[in-house]
């Protein structure tokens, strides 16, 4: 009987419309980018500007070190402890002015900032809905999140309901629903996660690194032979590119006196580096068809077993609006939202930048968020939901975005 590797090898390339794996792989000269260096800082309710500025100064030096070593560093970011969640509504409103100042400081350095979760206890606080809208109107570089599940308390249903209401409100706050790019509902997300909008900090000043490695994954699978174990092949390829980054990071930590939290090994895709293409390099079938779930599991097994110190999700990301091939396969109706949730059971980050109809109800979103929270709780893994309600669009219609980081996509059906 043929092995799993033989089946993948013999499957051929039928159905792989719109991509040429050989050309795509050859076109990528440097297979790894540093998506983010994220510095973590502990702030008091005063939201001290000098603490943020010190983190930005550190990030400038850290970026210079990585750039000098030949790495493209796409973003630098600062994440704080969940100080906003500790404030009463009146104090939270007063904090908006200081957050505006932080936003100006952050923007001047070409960085972005996360306040950490704004809701961490399972209670109803609808004042956070309007506050979230005011924040995204008043700032350009600040992200927020909520906690819909935690390892200690499990699912937080009241926060899930609140999060759904925030998503509906944010969809009407900025053009094209883009405010939801800066908000996510987080389940079991640990401190030190470098990726936004769920990043948050706890403890001594530290930093973490997020990487963009879909090209590494694709190269590893494109060169796979029948005798190769795909997990071992990918693990070796990842170690080859991640260990040099970790060596630089530990050196930075020693010089700067900051804790090195680790590398989030998640292969964050972008428009020109597709995780869907990497998966199809393994399955030789369009993403969403048979074999996709197993491929997700294989990739995740490699991501979870690298030789570097890992942090955050360290799992497979499937962001529909950031990966043109994922968006294309969704438009071909090869997978749906529930399929992505299924893939999350064996892979990574949950539901990320999923385009939904603009009139989706808060009740429908709440149900989906509770599903994400339940899955994260049952499997004891970090998941999140960043959902894009597209104003004026219905399921099946094409949504276009005037944003360099987002790709056009068919709006997906929720229920």
List each language-model region with its residue ranges.
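N-terminal secretory signal peptides and thylakoid transit peptides that target proteins
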Residues: 1-14
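C-terminal segment of N-terminal export signals and the immediately downstream linker at the start
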Residues: 1-2, 19-30
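Generic detector of intrinsically disordered, low-complexity, polar/charged segments
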Residues: 9-12, 19, 113, 355
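Anaerobic metallocofactor- and corrinoid-dependent redox/one-carbon enzyme cores
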Residues: 25-415
């Amino acid at each position: 009987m043929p092995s799993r590797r033989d089946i993948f090898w013999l499957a051929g390339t039928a159905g792989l419309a719109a991509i040429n794996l050989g050309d795509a792989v050859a076109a990528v000269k440097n297979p790894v980018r540093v998506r983010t260096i994220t510095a973590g800082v502990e702030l008091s309710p005063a939201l001290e500007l000098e603490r943020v500025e010190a983190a930005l100064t550190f990030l400038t030096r850290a970026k210079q070190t990585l750039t000098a070593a030949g790495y493209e560093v796409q973003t630098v970011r600062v994440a704080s402890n969940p100080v906003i969640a500790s404030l009463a509504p009146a104090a939270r409103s007063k904090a908006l002015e200081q957050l505006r100042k932080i936003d100006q400081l952050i923007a001047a350095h070409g960085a972005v900032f996360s306040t950490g979760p704004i809701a961490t206890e399972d209670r109803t606080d609808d004042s956070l809905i309007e506050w979230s809208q005011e924040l995204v109107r008043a700032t350009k570089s600040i992200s927020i999140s909520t906690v819909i599940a935690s390892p200690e308390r499990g699912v937080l249903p009241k926060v899930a309901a609140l999060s759904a209401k925030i998503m509906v409100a944010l969809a009407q706050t900025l053009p094209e629903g883009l405010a939801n790019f800066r908000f996510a509902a987080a389940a079991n997300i640990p401190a030190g996660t470098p990726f936004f909008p769920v990043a948050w900090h706890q403890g001594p000043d530290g930093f973490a690194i997020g990487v963009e490695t879909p090209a590494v994954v694709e190269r590893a699978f494109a060169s796979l032979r029948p005798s190769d174990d795909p997990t071992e092949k990918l693990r070796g390829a990842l170690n080859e590119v991640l260990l040099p980054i970790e060596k630089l990071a530990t050196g930075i930590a020693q010089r700067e006196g900051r804790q090195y939290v680790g590398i989030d090994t998640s292969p964050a895709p972008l428009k020109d580096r597709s995780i869907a293409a990497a998966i199809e390099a393994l399955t030789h079938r369009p993403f969403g068809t048979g074999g996709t779930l197993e491929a997700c599991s294989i990739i995740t097994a490699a991501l979870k077993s690298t030789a570097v110190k890992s942090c955050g999700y360290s799992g497979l990301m499937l962001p529909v609006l950031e990966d043109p091939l994922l968006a294309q396969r969704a438009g071909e109706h090869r997978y749906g939202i529930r399929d992505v949730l299924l893939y999350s059971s064996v892979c990574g980050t949950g539901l990320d930048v999923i385009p939904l109809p603009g009139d989706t109800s808060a009740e429908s979103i709440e149900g989906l968020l509770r599903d994400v929270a339940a899955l994260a709780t049952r499997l004891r893994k970090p998941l999140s939901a960043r959902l894009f309600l597209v104003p004026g669009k219905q399921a099946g219609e094409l949504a276009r975005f005037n944003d360099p980081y987002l790709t056009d996509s068919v709006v997906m059906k929720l229920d």
